[in-house]
């Protein structure tokens, strides 16, 4: 849904999502990012330890290689709206964002109390707390100038999977009431709004029809695995109008040796050969790569598993289409001398999506970008672990950004009886030093610089040879 004051032109783009995948869920719209945007993703542990923001940036790195922008993870584990507001100036505004996404609600609504006898009263209490705390956040956000606000309704708590019986009944129902508060605020203030909850519930329950123990939301019912985060990225990018944008659309007629369509690419040196067709193509984008390896603490699934719940994912967000008519028989397709596949003329005349072939030179280039972006994510995680220590423990104790010996003594004191905090001793000892933080920031900047050097598409030679 669009609530931005200047977005009326986009109203006509609202479409009903495919009912088989997202039943009873209306498509929503967010303005695409622009060159030079600085985007901060504000949230709790789902943002903090998750990948959705990294995957969104990876899409922009590969699909818009000439449009450099910057994104930052501003999540802190365990935060409610109250803690987000407390760290907001130091953690978020200090990054000078031009776009700010804001999500909360998982921690605000409570947990085990939903299984107590007075769960209804507890739910009302937590909703009222969330309303009051979010109202303060709303006033803060309203006071900011020059920042585009995007309210994001949180990913769900999985209260339907049967993989165990440890379920906080109706917790997600209360989370949806919190999301309604965000939607109302978006309407009041002309902010953009995207609900992740209902579409992800729909995706989850679709799989649970055949496998009741399935969960997209993670083994703790709270934190989506990598495939769940890629589903979040899909919903976000879909809302930005990226679904259906071509990596390249190459259409040629081999009989005439002519290009019939070239979308988001430039085709040249078309040459009919005795047994097929040869041409060069320079695409404006790279494929959107899907990682098959799990990343992040406690995660078990690679992002590529998103295709189980969104089978059209690759065609929707990474369509590098090749269509060639006027051929007969079976043909070998090679790119830069690398054999890609043997294809029938009928298949080629219908068209193929080259993004489904991970060994093409252009997909391999995209995988390099992905690997560098993952390295950047890992460095950024050090800052988010430090943020948890700094804002949730040191700041309340009066030692925000304090690298004095007195602060170190307070940290050691706070670690007593808190095993989670004690496990971050190494993080504290490193990140409390501004020189160390500066070095890691330079490392991330270097990685991003390198990404925007290596993500530039290259011209490739395509050869179709009859077998």
Model-derived features: where do they sit?
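Bacterial Sec-dependent N-terminal signal peptides
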Residues: 1-30
């Amino acid at each position: 849904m669009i609530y931005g004051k200047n977005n009326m032109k986009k109203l006509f783009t609202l479409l009903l999502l495919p009912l088989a995948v997202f039943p009873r869920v209306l498509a929503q719209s967010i303005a695409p990012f622009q060159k030079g945007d600085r985007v901060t993703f504000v949230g709790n542990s789902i943002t903090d330890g998750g990948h959705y923001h990294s995957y969104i940036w990876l899409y922009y790195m590969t699909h818009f290689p000439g449009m450099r922008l910057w994104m930052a993870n501003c999540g802190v584990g365990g935060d409610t709206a109250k803690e987000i507001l407390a760290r907001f100036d130091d953690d978020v505004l200090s990054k000078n964002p031009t776009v700010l996404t804001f999500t909360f609600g998982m921690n605000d609504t409570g947990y085990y109390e939903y299984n107590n006898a007075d769960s209804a009263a507890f739910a009302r209490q937590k909703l009222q707390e969330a309303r009051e705390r979010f109202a303060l956040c709303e006033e803060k956000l309203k006071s900011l100038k020059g920042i585009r606000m995007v309210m994001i309704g949180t990913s769900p708590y999985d209260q339907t999977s049967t993989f165990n019986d440890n379920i906080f009944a109706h917790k997600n129902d209360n989370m949806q009431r919190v999301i309604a508060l965000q939607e109302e605020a978006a309407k009041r203030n002309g902010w953009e709004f995207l609900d992740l909850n209902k579409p992800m519930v729909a995706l989850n329950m679709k799989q649970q029809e055949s496998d009741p123990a399935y969960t997209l939301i993670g083994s703790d019912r709270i934190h989506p695995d990598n495939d769940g985060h890629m589903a979040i990225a899909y919903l976000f990018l879909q809302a930005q109008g990226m679904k259906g944008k071509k990596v390249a659309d190459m259409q040629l007629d081999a009989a005439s040796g002519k290009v019939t369509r070239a979308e988001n690419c430039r085709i040249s040196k078309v040459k009919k050969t005795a047994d097929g067709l040869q041409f060069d193509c320079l695409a404006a984008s790279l494929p959107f790569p899907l990682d098959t390896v799990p990343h992040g603490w406690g995660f078990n699934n690679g992002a590529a598993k998103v295709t189980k719940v969104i089978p059209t994912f690759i065609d929707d967000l990474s369509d590098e289409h090749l269509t060639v008519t006027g051929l007969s028989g079976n043909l070998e397709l090679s790119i830069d001398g690398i054999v890609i596949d043997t294809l029938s003329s009928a298949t080629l005349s219908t068209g193929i999506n080259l993004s489904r072939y991970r060994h093409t030179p252009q997909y391999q280039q995209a995988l390099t970008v992905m690997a560098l972006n993952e390295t950047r994510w890992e460095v950024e995680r050090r800052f988010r672990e430090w943020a948890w220590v700094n804002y949730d423990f040191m700041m309340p104790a009066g030692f925000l950004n304090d690298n004095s010996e007195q602060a170190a003594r307070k940290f050691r004191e706070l670690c007593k009886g808190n095993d989670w905090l004690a496990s971050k001793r190494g993080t504290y000892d490193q990140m409390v030093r501004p020189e160390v933080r500066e070095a890691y920031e330079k490392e991330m900047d270097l990685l991003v610089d390198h990404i925007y050097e290596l993500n530039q598409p290259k011209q490739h030679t395509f050869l179709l040879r009859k077998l």
